[in-house]
């Protein structure tokens, strides 16, 4: 039990703190509700409250403020009162508001439902109410100023001009409903920061006009309602035009874009049809809103401090977590370029506040009017939970309008990284609505997706949809280009060979690995399915244990190639190969030599183990094999061909050769002379595939357009040549005659030599050379021409053709000639009689018998 309590103790303290926090929050909430009910009862008096409720119902965001955040009556009088005018301005007001919504390029569309009404509508409505009456009364105690984002300088200038012109008309006049706009426009001129020269001129002109407006304050003599404490006071009703002005003002202001007021924490905009019934709503709703706002103003400083601390703590944790996550998935170079790139949903309000906004906000804090404005606007911002800052994407990039060009475009994206999150919560919220921060926000968004370069280069982002599309589509492009940039180029001295191995790698792999890879494909063709030779075996090579190595710049072709072949009995072949070829792979990796098993179907009891490599690696491979197979004979049986070969030939594995010491059935397909023949093994499994190959080659090379051999023609190249009866056979070039543009070819399947023009030969497809060459060139053993002749006589040739034509024969290899051709003994079976053809030619007097004739040569 003690162990369980000890494990639960670390969780007890945070839980207690959480419970205390919730208790404190709900207790404060109950106190506010009880106090608000009392205040609502005291406010339900007189017809004057009804008129005030009509104006306040249209703008429930901000009502009256506490006395601690209001100005003295004298100062408020200067800010809120304008010179009188002679007639109501309902129609000009409608035109001005509509033009404001059209000309502002930084504002979202009217249909934007993510923003909602805020202090702007309340301030305008209260100013209108305060200026209506017959005689001037005391200036209200709580005449709050418009928030920073409530108006634009050029609109205020136009208002003041119209009010000044109308106010000079003699006679009875009515105060303008836009008295506070001139002073507020001057106040917001620093925080707007649109960067346009026209706006700057309007701000300076506005300052002069505002002074004229203030100079006419003392002339106004109209009753004004004091929403802060004048509960018993009445409001004198003006002419019927005032009611129209109020209704139109409420309707038009309700349609204004909500980015005037609160860009983030706000309620959805209500429909236009619902605005009129709301003005005529019950007094209970209005009183509750009034009481709620009065109580919220008292708790603004405490709530600001608590939420600001919690907001900064959560944002810092999320930012650190996302940076750590991206550091593991993105390369170091990208991480250094974008150190603050993070895609958390809750941290955008911090990372996307530009430095220019912070400076403007810092200047505004010194102004007491702006402090009161922030205190007035904060209750509506704090009344709702924070929402995702997606609304920032709707305002930065808007299309051009009739009055002005779009102020923000993808062309203005800054490549500077986003500033760190060091601003308080209120500054972040106010900065998010600053039209000046749109460019910097787009830059921050591009940094978060690591697509700054792509977005700035495209320059086509004219709306939020295309901006968000580029944010997603440019990520892969930047990632791939970053990967390419991080790949270092090869040094000048590092030149790859044709086999893909660099010179510097040869020092690790060893000298023999270079030529081993070069000669991989030379001896792999024609091997059986049990052969362990593979073309891509160089991929499995590792660094050998041998201490020998060559220099990085050495030429691997200069290394001497050693070929060692040993006979392996049939019962040891499986052990030598190993399960799934593991032991042969072990031998390759350990010794560094190339090793494969040649499986010949004619030698059923013996197979050949082929070893290629340098002397050191061959010795190491033989040593490993000898340790495991002590009864195995490691004598080299490989007989390299003489350098003076008269007839170049393909590698042995590409030819279907006759087995040594084994009698096999053959048929003679071509006869050069009586002692020189070409035979086929018609009992071999691959023999039947030759017929199908002939048909495919005939269909292929009967079509025009097959390319010819490149010139000069290379000796030993395999090609397709015309055969008998219009057929196309496989052939090998054995000699070239450049003076006559002719070559001598040897048919590799049907035997025989022929001299043809080069242009009649065709290039052969790779799939046509996979079948082993069926024609085996042989010589008769112990048979030579007569002493008087250098060649066999025509009679000998005819007799040989008669004995071998159209019949199956038995052949056995006895030895090899000096040119490498096998010497055979040939028997014909006639009934039960077996006739040795070699002896038969001698007995007929067409040849002479000579023992070891080719050996003596």
Swiss-Prot record:
Range of the transit peptide: 1-29
Keyword Transit peptide: yes
Consequence of gene disruption: Knockout in diabetogenic agent streptozotocin-treated mice results in significant cardiac dysfunction which is accompanied by impaired mitochondrial function and increased cardiomyocyte apoptosis.
Positions of modified residues (Phosphoserine): 55, 101, 103, 164, 527, 546
CDD domains, sorted: KH-I_AKAP1 (cd22395), Tudor_AKAP1 (cd20407)
Domain (KH) ranges: 561-625
InterPro entries in UniProt: KH-I_AKAP1, KH_dom, KH_dom_type_1, KH_dom_type_1_sf, SNase_OB-fold_sf, Tudor, Tudor_AKAP1, Tudor_domain_containing
Name assigned to this protein: A-kinase anchor protein 1, mitochondrial
Organism the protein comes from: Mus musculus
């Amino acid at each position: 039990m003690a162990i369980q309590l000890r494990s639960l103790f670390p969780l007890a303290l945070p839980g207690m703190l959480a419970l205390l926090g919730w208790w404190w929050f709900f207790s404060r909430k109950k106190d506010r509700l009880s106090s608000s009910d009392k205040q609502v009862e005291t406010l339900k008096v007189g017809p004057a409250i009804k008129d005030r409720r009509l104006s306040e119902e249209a703008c429930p965001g901000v009502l009256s403020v506490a006395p601690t955040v209001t100005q003295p009556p004298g100062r408020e009088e200067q800010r809120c009162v304008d010179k009188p005018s002679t007639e109501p301005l309902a129609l000009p007001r409608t035109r001005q508001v509509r033009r404001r919504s059209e000309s502002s390029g930084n504002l979202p569309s009217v249909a934007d439902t993510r923003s909602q009404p805020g202090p702007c509508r309340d301030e305008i409505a209260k100013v209108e109410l305060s200026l209506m009456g017959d005689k001037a009364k005391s200036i209200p105690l709580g005449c709050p100023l418009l928030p920073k984002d409530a108006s634009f300088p050029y609109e205020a200038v136009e208002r003041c001009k119209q009010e000044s012109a109308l106010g000079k008309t003699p006679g009875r006049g009515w105060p303008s409903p836009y008295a506070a706009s001139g002073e507020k426009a001057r106040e917001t001129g620093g925080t707007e920061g649109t960067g346009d020269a026209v706006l700057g001129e309007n701000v300076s002109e506005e300052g002069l006009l505002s002074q004229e407006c203030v100079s006419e304050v003392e002339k106004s003599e109209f009753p004004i309602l004091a929403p802060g404490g004048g509960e018993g006071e009445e409001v004198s009703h003006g002419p019927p035009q005032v009611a129209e002005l109020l209704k139109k003002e409420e309707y038009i202001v309700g349609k204004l874009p909500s980015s005037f007021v609160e860009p983030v924490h706000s309620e959805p905009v209500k429909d236009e049809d619902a605005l009129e019934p709301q003005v005529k709503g019950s007094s209970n709703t209005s009183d509750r809103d009034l009481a709620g706002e009065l109580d919220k103003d008292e708790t603004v400083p405490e709530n600001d401090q608590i939420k600001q601390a919690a907001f900064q703590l959560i944002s810092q944790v999320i930012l650190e977590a996302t940076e750590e996550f991206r550091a593991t998935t993105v390369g170091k170079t990208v991480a250094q370029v974008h150190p603050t790139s993070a895609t958390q949903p809750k941290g955008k309000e911090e990372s996307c506040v530009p430095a220019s906004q912070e400076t403007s906000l810092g200047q505004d804090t010194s102004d007491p009017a702006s402090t009161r404005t922030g205190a007035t606007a904060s209750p509506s911002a704090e009344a709702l939970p924070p929402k995702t800052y997606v609304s920032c994407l709707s305002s930065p990039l808007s299309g051009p309008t009739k009055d002005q060009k779009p102020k923000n475009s993808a062309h203005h994206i800054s490549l500077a990284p986003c500033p760190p999150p060091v601003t308080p919560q209120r500054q972040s919220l106010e900065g998010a609505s600053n039209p000046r921060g749109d460019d910097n926000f787009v830059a921050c968004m591009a940094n978060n997706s690591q697509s700054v370069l792509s977005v700035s280069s495209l320059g086509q982002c004219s709306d939020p949809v295309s901006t968000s599309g580029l944010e997603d589509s440019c990520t892969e492009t930047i990632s791939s280009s970053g990967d390419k940039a991080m790949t270092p180029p090869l040094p000048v001295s590092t030149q790859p060979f044709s086999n893909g191995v660099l010179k510097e790698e040869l020092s690790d792999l060893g000298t023999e690995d270079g030529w081993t890879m070069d000669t991989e494909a030379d001896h792999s063709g024609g091997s059986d399915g049990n052969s362990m030779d593979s073309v891509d075996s160089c991929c499995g090579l590792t660094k050998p244990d041998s201490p020998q190595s060559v220099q990085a710049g050495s030429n691997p072709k200069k290394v001497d190639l050693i070929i060692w072949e040993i006979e392996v009995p049939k019962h040891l072949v499986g052990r030598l190969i190993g399960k799934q070829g593991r032991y042969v792979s072990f031998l390759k990796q350990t010794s560094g030599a190339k090793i494969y098993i040649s499986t010949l179907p004619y030698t059923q009891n013996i197979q050949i183990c082929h070893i290629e490599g340098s002397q050191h690696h061959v010795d190491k491979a033989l040593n490993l094999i000898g340790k495991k197979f002590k009864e195995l004979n490691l004598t080299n049986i490989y007989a390299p061909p003489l350098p003076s070969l008269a007839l170049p030939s393909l590698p042995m594995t590409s030819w279907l050769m006759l087995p040594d010491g084994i009698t096999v059935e053959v048929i003679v397909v071509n006869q050069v002379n009586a002692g020189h023949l070409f035979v086929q093994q018609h009992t071999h499994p691959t023999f039947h595939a030759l017929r199908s190959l002939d048909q495919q080659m005939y269909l292929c090379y009967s079509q025009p357009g097959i390319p010819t051999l490149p010139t000069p023609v290379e000796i030993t190249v395999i090609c397709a040549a015309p055969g008998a009866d219009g057929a196309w056979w496989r052939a090998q070039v054995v000699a070239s005659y450049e003076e006559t543009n002719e070559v001598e070819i040897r048919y590799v399947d049907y035997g025989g030599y022929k001299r043809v023009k080069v242009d009649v030969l065709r290039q052969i497809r790779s799939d046509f050379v996979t079948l082993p060459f069926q024609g085996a060139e042989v010589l008769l053993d112990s048979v030579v021409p007569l002493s008087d002749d250098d060649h066999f006589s025509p009679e000998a040739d005819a007799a040989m053709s008669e004995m071998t034509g159209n019949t199956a024969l038995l052949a056995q290899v006895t030895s090899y000639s000096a040119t490498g051709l096998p010497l055979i003994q040939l028997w014909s079976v006639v009934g039960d009689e077996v006739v040795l053809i070699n002896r038969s030619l001698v007995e007929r007097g067409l040849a002479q018998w000579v023992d070891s004739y080719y050996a003596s040569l």
